[in-house]
């Protein structure tokens, strides 16, 4: 779940914080896809903030890393649960 906007999660570098580093997010997906025999799915937010959103580019990178399906949440992480 790379879409979790909860500060407690994001400050550890997990959840939506991974959107700040698409290559790190791709490495996570790549490692998971290699480690399991079931499809790896990913949920992302459209970006960290509305002005830095790049959901298509992020989704394409995660697909190339091995994600079988990607769900894009329409709000940015900064918008939390508004």
Where are each of the predicted segments found?
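Flavin-dependent oxidoreductase catalytic cores
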Residues: 1-82
């Amino acid at each position: 779940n790379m879409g979790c906007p909860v500060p407690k999660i994001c400050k550890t570098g997990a959840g939506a914080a991974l959107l700040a580093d698409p290559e790190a997010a791709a490495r996570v997906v790549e490692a998971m896809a290699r480690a399991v025999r079931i499809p790896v799915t990913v949920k992302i937010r459209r970006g960290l903030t509305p002005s830095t959103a790049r959901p298509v580019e992020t989704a394409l990178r995660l697909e190339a890393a091995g994600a079988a399906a990607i769900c894009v949440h329409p709000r940015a992480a900064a918008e939390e649960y508004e």
